[in-house]
């Protein structure tokens, strides 16, 4: 028999259980999505953890009035560059080629993206952009709307069949922090005076958190254009003006190149498409999030590089002495990541980022990152922000010499890597790169030598159901000299993701074989971690003078084609073990 006390206790327990059940349901509604929806929503963070938890994202959201979202639509990725072949010899040929690629991309993506946008009530977003050339929609949304009814908006978007992924951008972006001091370090001035190369006919795009001051005296008589439209309130910044000056001012690397400047607002697709519509050959990015994570931005830049045959050069970041985290842009496997050396080219600056969380190696190369006196700007600068435009300027000079390099980004990266030197006896990793310096410190003299005296190649390797050799070519090397061979092959994006597993990187090997004896004198890429990288450096002392066959092959079958870039050079070792002049 129940006493009144027992009944009261039962009632109290029941009430407590009801309260707890309500709290649980509230928590579940707020922080638990169905598995189908949860798999399609990614909160991208800014620390070493690739994604933030719902608790962490809420703290960040509550501190922001608006937040960026990057929506991947549910359609197949295509690579226009693999679908359209054209001989390119002149700058006019390049423009015709790029227009054809954009038309292919537009026909495949634009209407499907519009259909997807119509299903998600795009009118509630600010700064919305529907991509013409890739499977993305980007927008900004008021934080209050995003969090309303326990993230009902996110759940609604992710539940649509036309949507593949929704990325909530909670990252912190920052710019990665006269000119002749640094240029002397790469042996540029003397070669510029004797060769006369100025980057003429080359178009450089620049993506920054700000735009250039078009009226700055450094751009007098130059083609220096900033996107200025009423619906994008872009801000002129000294950082953007400084980066551009390194490339195209009279004292810059490529003074006759044209430059197009755009401010990075939300997700990068709208800004990059504006640059593509200017027919740029190179995109310099001295900005990003230093997280060491491969994220949706990394995947996007990887895709654009190969799909539209444009070289993307990115600052590695300035976190070297704070944790080492690489910029998310520079994490792209098809992106040319640039670290910072000192202005004397004797070593890598301590601030230069080098750490990645996916096992790949970055940076690709290093260039001077200090010794910059910013004429007509009124400040000094240092860091990888100023290293990247040196490489972009050198690429413009190379493209002026050989216009076909404009549409061969893998070849251009291979050449840059082969043109590097490093006189400090640090250990290389299994792919032939130094931990902090990548392939080494850039030399313009070496770059010209490769372009004019050594063979370098760009080829498309078809999809194959077999393993083994996919590319072979003969090079002639001299006994006693050091041979440096650089190879890089394209990574193909199959979906945007915060995981590098979204990028298909074929597992490949590189052998160097003596053509006369058949002996393998150097081999790389046979280890269990070969799948982590899409680039190798082979560096060895040549045993005998003669022909050597470079053999590049796959260790596994694959269903997609690759672009391969190969470059090589030889040099003599000085008595102290450094590279002789």
Where are these regions (language model features)?
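Primarily auto-inhibitory N-terminal propeptides
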Residues: 24-123, 165-167
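Autoinhibitory propeptides
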Residues: 31-42, 114-194, 536
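Subtilisin-like serine protease catalytic core
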Residues: 190-268, 281, 292-293, 306-309, ...
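Extracellular S/T/G-rich loop segment that most often corresponds to the catalytic His/Ser-adjacent loop
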Residues: 208, 325-400
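Short acidic, glycine-rich surface-loop motifs adjacent to enzyme active sites
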Residues: 275-297, 314-316, 488
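C-terminal subdomain of the subtilisin-like protease fold in secreted/lumenal serine endopeptidases
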Residues: 284, 400-479, 524-538, 579-581
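C-terminal edge strands of extracellular/lumenal beta-sandwich accessory domains
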Residues: 411-414, 473, 501-503, 514-516, ...
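Short coil-to-beta strand junction motifs in C2/discoidin
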Residues: 496-509
């Amino acid at each position: 028999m129940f006493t009144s006390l027992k009944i009261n206790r039962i009632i109290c327990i029941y009430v407590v259980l009801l309260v707890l059940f309500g709290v649980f349901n509230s928590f579940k509604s707020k922080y638990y999505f169905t598995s189908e929806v949860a798999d399609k929503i990614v909160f991208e963070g800014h620390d070493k953890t690739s994604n933030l938890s719902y608790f962490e994202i809420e703290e960040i959201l509550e501190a922001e009035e608006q937040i960026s979202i990057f929506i991947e639509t549910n359609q197949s990725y295509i690579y226009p560059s693999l679908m359209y072949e054209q001989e390119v010899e002149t700058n006019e040929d390049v423009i015709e080629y790029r227009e054809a690629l954009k038309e292919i991309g537009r026909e495949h993506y634009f209407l499907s993206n519009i259909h997807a946008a119509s299903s998600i009530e795009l009118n509630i977003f600010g700064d919305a952009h529907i991509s013409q050339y890739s499977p993305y929609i980007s927008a900004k949304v008021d934080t209050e709307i995003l969090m309303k009814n326990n993230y009902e908006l996110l759940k609604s978007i992710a539940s649509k069949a036309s949507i593949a992924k929704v990325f909530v951008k909670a990252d912190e972006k920052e710019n990665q922090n006269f000119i002749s001091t640094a240029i002397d370090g790469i042996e540029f001035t003397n070669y510029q005076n004797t060769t006369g190369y100025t980057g003429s006919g080359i178009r450089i795009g620049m993506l920054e958190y700000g735009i250039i001051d078009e009226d700055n005296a450094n751009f007098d008589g130059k083609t220096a254009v900033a996107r200025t439209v009423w619906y994008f309130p872009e801000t002129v910044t000294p950082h953007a003006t400084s980066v551009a000056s390194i490339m195209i001012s009279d004292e810059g690397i490529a003074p006759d190149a044209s430059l197009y400047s755009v401010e990075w607002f939300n997700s990068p697709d709208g800004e990059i498409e504006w640059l593509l519509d200017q027919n740029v050959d190179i995109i310099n990015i001295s900005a990003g999030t230093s997280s060491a994570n491969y994220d949706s931005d990394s995947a996007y830049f990887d895709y654009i590089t190969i799909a539209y045959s444009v070289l993307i050069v990115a600052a590695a970041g300035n976190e070297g002495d704070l944790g080492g985290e690489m910029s998310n842009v520079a994490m792209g496997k098809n992106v040319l990541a640039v670290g910072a050396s000192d202005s004397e080219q004797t070593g890598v600056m301590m601030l230069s980022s080098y750490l990645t969380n996916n096992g790949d190696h970055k940076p690709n190369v290093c260039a001077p990152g200090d010794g910059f006196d910013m004429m007509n700007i009124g400040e000094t600068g240092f860091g990888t922000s100023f290293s990247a435009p040196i490489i972009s300027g050198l690429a413009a000079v190379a493209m002026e010499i050989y216009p076909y390099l404009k549409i061969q980004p893998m070849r251009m990266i291979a050449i840059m890597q082969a043109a590097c030197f490093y006189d400090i006896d640090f250990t290389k990793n299994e792919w032939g790169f130094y931990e902090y310096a990548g392939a080494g410190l850039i030399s313009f003299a070496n770059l010209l030598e490769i372009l004019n005296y050594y063979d370098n190649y760009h080829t498309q390797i078809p999809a194959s159901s077999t393993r083994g050799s996919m590319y072979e070519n003969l090079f002639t090397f001299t006994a006693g000299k050091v041979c440096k061979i650089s190879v890089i092959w394209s990574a193909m994006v199959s979906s945007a993701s915060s995981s590098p597993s979204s990028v298909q990187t074929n597992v490949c090997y590189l052998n160097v074989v003596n053509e006369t004896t058949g002996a393998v004198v150097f081999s790389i890429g046979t280890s269990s971690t070969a799948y982590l990288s899409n680039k190798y450096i082979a560096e060895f002392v040549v045993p005998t003078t003669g022909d050597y066959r470079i053999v590049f092959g796959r260790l596994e079958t694959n269903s997609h084609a690759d672009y391969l870039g190969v470059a090589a050079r030889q040099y003599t070792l000085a008595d102290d073990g450094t590279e002789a002049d």
